[in-house]
Amino acid sequence: LDTDSTRITSSFNYFPDSELQNLIRQVNQTRAYYKKQGFDEVYLSIIPNKTSIVAPKMGRYNHLVERVQQNSMLKTPFIDSWTPFVQHSQEVYSLSDTHWNCKGQAMWLEAVNHYLSEPKFSILNHSEQNL
């Protein structure tokens, strides 16, 4: 399904800039909504499908993940799984299907933990802000 360009989930499905802008607006609106509901922050983490990492040259690749993450309209902080997945492309997905394997899951979790362990997320800083 990742390679069938007629399906919206395909890495080769045409995704025009107008749809990209709409998608980013919706992501930003979702973040604003949940922040208004009391969440400290909302993050975006796009898990790239196997074809976009392992075989992007099988067709006319739409670069959707990169286009979202690099778009200046995106106000929602994102946790980048694209970069480490590309660097370890043959190691992060199951051989027999399109799902990520334990290494892929661990790499994503490591990226999340690294992002959340930055100084702005420390308990001390959070406590001081609430005084």
Roles of regions detected by a PLM:
Residues L1-L131:
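Extracellular glycan-modifying ectodomains
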